């Protein structure tokens, strides 16, 4: 609640205790206080609304809504009631009701600036742009203030952005907005910078670039003062749109003379120079070269200009990186034109060496040079690195001591050389022993570097952290190339050790998350991810690192929590962006409004959002359906309908940050655009499989309802096909998607370790669960046919069903065979993990659940038939009525399921016993090469993996026991 100031109105004084209780989260007391007040003052509407807020917050939504609607029906106009109702409706996620509230208030108090303003903002929350335009003008008529007028103009622009028909946007909304602003310009009523920005935005969207340029260069442009070079940047954008390269060149040259370290203007300068060369442009015989002054239209002039900037920089007391990097950029561009030798700019290797001498002690030196290493010939890389090492001030090496830096500057220089060594691929050409030798050296340098960071705060990174990261990357290379798991355990040990010295190092945490997950250990990952303290959009961009493994490693409670965490962000996005839009209107930041809308759409259409939503629903069904509630109840509570697909397939946005890991890999080993494209294809395919599976499951309970007669022409309401037709269509789609998925998996795509994470699709096919699940859905179709056709003359269908029962059991046994083996074993004194077995077990548990839901449907169809036959038998006292074998087959199948699930439960118990019996400490003690510190962290790492496996087995075992109980209830 908003805190109220000094209060005159006695009603405000009476309401004060309720506000206080609500502010402090004491909702029950707020309800009691409101009830007391309402006994004395029945007409105090605000007390009723505050009571409703208390009820809403204690989970009594329906009661709260009824109370709120009682007050809303009275169309209140007092500020307290309106504000309280606004808060309540927001908490109910019903912003559309706020608009009705203020529409009524405005009718009763037509000249209230405040209520008109609230009405406008209420429309903004629900995106009613047409009504916003009208509300803005109504407000301007009551109080002729410029901001209100321009609210209306902006609402027209929003109508143009949201219009489906682009032609309508260009011919109606934007021209009307332009005329409205021109009216203000003619009347000389433009007051604020925001109004000029809006005029510019309209002209730009209409493609009137020359008019927009005239506005910026004219008197109105003088109002653009809040951002540095705002006017120049807008002029530059228009020159580019108009392909006026002479002006682009002259303006960027002029801006570089002012600030020769502004990189964006170097790029524009080079772009324009080479465009002018391409067009063979020459200046006019008389007068200025261009509107913006002198133009450089040849490579010679560009070379001289850059050389002059470097000369000027050398005289300055402040070292600038821009001119030196611009020289390298110019060499690259001249080379691409095939004319480098003509202009003797120098050897890139020597230029980079000189750059390193000047800026090597700055952390940015590596990222600056990274862009230009492709200018180096491959044969010169080793020579270049040795040349750099030659100027790094290190101590004299001895037999047992490395050459070490004496201060932080020297450490930073050496670190830059090591990073460049990896980037140039020199580490990748080494064999296993050479790489392990490099790891030892890097870790010694890391330990030495910690001396310089003794005074660092916990929130600061150690100066030598990159040595540790580079060592881990080298160990991962060895692991990936040789399959030697010793190196991955060592990598985990180094990262855990690094984290104790740099608790805030996000790269350490991200790598730990990735490696633990790849080893199948989800337990340590939850806290690690949480400690990253991901903010806002990061839940979408890096959330995939957690949610990809959430369900697949058998820790259902943690998986559920992780999905909830991600979903909370996406659900609040809608509300949050509405507030940003309102603030943008209030403060006249009009150019930000389309950005906020685009941002909201990007999140609503997020691939990660769709994945988490689907997985969360499947997880909820797995944990609840037919355990705490029936499948039908679970599906109803989730509002699931098989005919509805709420995933925006055509507009899905991949917002994942696939470059979140620092990478020093050469270009041919790094994450490429092709990797990203393939990963998106794989993710979309897997999402489609999961979504179709969910929709098929959600259609099962609806088949239990009275069925339509055979050959019935009747269809369901609103022309929707009958329920079984929907399921058949979904089944066809699932089968087609599975075929596409199989073809994709056959490509055997290997992503870089630091790139996209493969989906669970490969495991789904390899475990045999895909075939199992699709077979069970085909069984549904056969059982439905039997249900509609009856037992007579359906021998063929019954035979199919009997075969399906046998086949399903065989397929499940096959899946179980792929789950056998120890998750953690000691081989030749080394620890070996088998995370695939864990993933297969998780798929088995999920598949068993799907099959039990299908079996439950089979039971609901077969039981009435059997009962009818038994009744007939009793009535006629005949023994000649033969029970069809389908009943016996079902009972045998259920018995088989029970036996199989019992066997899997026993197998899981066996795995637990084996894990507990493993003496990992003895293994660590046997390794004499480890220091006491390394032993400590090795013990931590191995203990975490062991504990996580046990946790996963425990949760899966518990869930399977519940499924076993469900199986025992399947009787006909």
Curated annotation (Swiss-Prot):
TPR repeat spans: 11-44, 45-78, 79-112, 114-146
Keyword annotations from UniProtKB, A to Z: Cytoplasm, Repeat, TPR repeat
Principal cellular location given in the protein's record: cytoplasm
Effect the entry attributes to changing residue 789 to R: In a breast cancer sample; somatic mutation
GO biological process: cytoskeleton organization
Any one Gene Ontology molecular-function term assigned to this protein's record: acetyltransferase activator activity
Cellular compartments annotated: Cytoplasm
GO CC aspect terms: cytoplasm; cytosol; Golgi apparatus; NatB complex
InterPro entries linked: NAA25_NatB_aux_su (IPR019183), TPR-like_helical_dom_sf (IPR011990)
Chain ranges passing through the membrane: none
SUBUNIT field: Component of the N-terminal acetyltransferase B (NatB) complex which is composed of NAA20 and NAA25.
Family: Belongs to the MDM20/NAA25 family.
Role, per record: Non-catalytic subunit of the NatB complex which catalyzes acetylation of the N-terminal methionine residues of peptides beginning with Met-Asp, Met-Glu, Met-Asn and Met-Gln. May play a role in normal cell-cycle progression.
Protein name (Swiss-Prot/TrEMBL): N-alpha-acetyltransferase 25, NatB auxiliary subunit
Organism, as annotated: Homo sapiens
């Amino acid at each position: 609640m908003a805190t109220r100031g000094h209060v005159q109105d006695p009603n405000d004084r009476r309401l004060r205790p309720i506000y206080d209780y609500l502010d402090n989260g004491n909702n029950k007391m707020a309800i009691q206080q409101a009830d007391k007040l309402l006994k004395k003052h029945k007409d105090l509407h605000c007390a009723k609304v505050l009571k409703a807020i208390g009820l809403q917050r204690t989970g009594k939504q329906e009661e709260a809504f009824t109370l709120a609607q009682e007050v809303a029906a009275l169309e209140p106009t007092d500020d307290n009631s309106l504000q309280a109702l606004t808060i309540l409706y927001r908490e109910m996620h019903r912003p559309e009701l706020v608009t009705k509230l203020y529409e009524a208030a405005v009718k009763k108090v037509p000249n209230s600036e405040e209520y008109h303003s609230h009405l406008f903002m209420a429309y903004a929350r629900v995106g009613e742009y047409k009504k916003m335009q009208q509300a803005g003008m109504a407000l301007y008529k009551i109080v002729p203030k410029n901001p209100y007028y321009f609210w209306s103009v902006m609402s027209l622009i929003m109508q143009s952005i949201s219009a489906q028909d682009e032609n309508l946007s260009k011919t109606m909304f934007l021209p009307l907005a332009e005329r409205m602003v021109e009216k203000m310009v003619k009347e000389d009523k433009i007051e604020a910078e925001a109004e000029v920005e809006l005029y510019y935005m309209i002209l730009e969207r209409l493609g009137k670039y020359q008019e927009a340029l005239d506005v910026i260069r004219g008197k109105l442009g003088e109002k653009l003062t809040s951002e540095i070079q705002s006017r120049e940047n807008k002029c530059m954008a228009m020159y580019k749109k108009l392909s006026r390269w002479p002006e682009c060149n002259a303006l960027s040259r002029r801006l570089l003379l002012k600030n020769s370290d502004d990189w964006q203007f170097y790029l524009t300068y080079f772009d324009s120079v080479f465009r002018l060369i391409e067009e063979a442009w020459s200046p006019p015989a008389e007068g200025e070269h261009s509107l913006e002054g002198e133009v450089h239209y040849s490579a010679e002039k560009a070379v001289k200009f850059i050389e002059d900037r470097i000369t000027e920089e050398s005289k300055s007391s402040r070292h600038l990186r821009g001119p030196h990097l611009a020289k390298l950029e110019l060499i690259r561009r001249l080379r691409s034109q095939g004319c480098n030798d003509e202009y003797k700019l120098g050897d890139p290797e020597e230029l980079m060496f000189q750059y390193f001498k000047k800026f090597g002690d700055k952390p940015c030196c590596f990222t600056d040079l990274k862009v230009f290493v492709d200018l180096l010939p491959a044969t010169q890389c080793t020579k270049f690195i040795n040349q750099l090492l030659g100027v790094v001030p290190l101590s004299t090496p001895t037999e047992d001591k490395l050459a070490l830096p004496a201060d932080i500057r020297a450490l930073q220089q050496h670190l830059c050389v090591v990073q460049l060594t990896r980037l140039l691929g020199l580490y990748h050409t080494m064999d296993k022993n050479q790489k392990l030798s490099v790891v030892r050296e890097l870790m010694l340098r890391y330990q030495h570097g910690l001396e310089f960071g003794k005074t660092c705060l916990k929130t600061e990174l150690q100066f030598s952290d990159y040595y540790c990261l580079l060592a881990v990357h080298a160990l991962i290379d060895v692991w990936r190339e040789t399959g030697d798991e010793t190196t991955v355990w060592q990598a985990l040990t180094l990262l855990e050790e690094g984290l104790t010295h740099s608790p805030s190092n996000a790269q350490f945490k991200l790598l730990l998350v990735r490696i633990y997950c790849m080893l199948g250990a989800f337990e340590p990952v939850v806290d690690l991810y949480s400690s990253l303290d991901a903010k806002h959009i990061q839940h979408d961009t890096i959330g995939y690192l957690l949610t990809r493994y959430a369900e697949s490693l058998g820790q259902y409670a943690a998986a559920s929590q992780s999905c909830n965490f991600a979903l909370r962000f996406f659900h609040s996005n809608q509300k949050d962006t509405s507030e940003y839009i309102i603030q943008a209107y209030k403060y006249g930041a009009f150019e930000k409004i389309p950005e906020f809308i685009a941002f909201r759409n990007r999140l609503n259409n997020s691939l990660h959002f769709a994945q988490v939503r689907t997985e969360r629903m499947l997880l909820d069904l797995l944990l609840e359906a037919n355990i705490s509630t029936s499948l039908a109840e679970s599906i109803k509570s989730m509002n699931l309908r098989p005919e509805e697909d709420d995933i925006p397939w055509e507009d899905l946005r991949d917002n994942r940050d696939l470059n979140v890991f620092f990478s020093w890999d050469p270009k041919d080993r790094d994450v490429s655009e092709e990797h990203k494209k393939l990963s998106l294809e794989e993710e979309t395919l897997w999402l489609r499989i999961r979504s179709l599976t969910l929709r098929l499951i959600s259609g099962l309970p609806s088949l239990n309802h009275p069925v339509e007669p055979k050959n019935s022409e009747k269809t369901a309401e609103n022309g929707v096909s009958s329920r079984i037709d929907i399921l058949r269509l979904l089944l066809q789609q699932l089968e087609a998607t599975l075929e596409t998925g199989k073809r994709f998996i056959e490509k055997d795509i290997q992503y870089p370790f630091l790139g996209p994470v493969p989906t669970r699709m490969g495991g789904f096919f390899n475990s045999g669960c895909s075939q199992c699940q699709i077979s069970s859905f085909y069984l549904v179709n056969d059982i439905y046919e039997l249900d509609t056709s009856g037992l007579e003359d359906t021998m063929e269908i019954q035979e199919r069903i009997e075969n399906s029962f046998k086949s399903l059991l065989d397929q499940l046994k096959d899946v179980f065979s792929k789950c056998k083996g120890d998750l953690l074993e000691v081989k030749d004194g080394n620890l070996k993990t088998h995370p695939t077995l864990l993933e297969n077990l998780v798929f088995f548990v999920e598949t068993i659940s799907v099959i039990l839901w299908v079996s439950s449907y089979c039971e609901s169809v077969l039981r009435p038939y059997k009962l009818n036959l038994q009744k007939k038998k009793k009535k006629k006292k005949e023994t000649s009525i033969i029970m069809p074998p389908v009943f016996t087959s079902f009972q045998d199948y259920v018995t088989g399921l029970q036996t199989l699930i019992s066997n899997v439960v026993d197998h899981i118990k066996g795995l637990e016993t084996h894990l507990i019996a493993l003496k990992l400490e003895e293994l660590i003690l046997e390794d004499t090469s480890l220091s006491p510190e390394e032993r400590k962290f090795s013990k931590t790492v191995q203990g975490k993996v062991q504990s996580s496996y046990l946790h996963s087995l425990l949760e899966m075992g518990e869930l399977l026991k519940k499924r076993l109980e469900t199986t025992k209830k399947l009787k006909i």
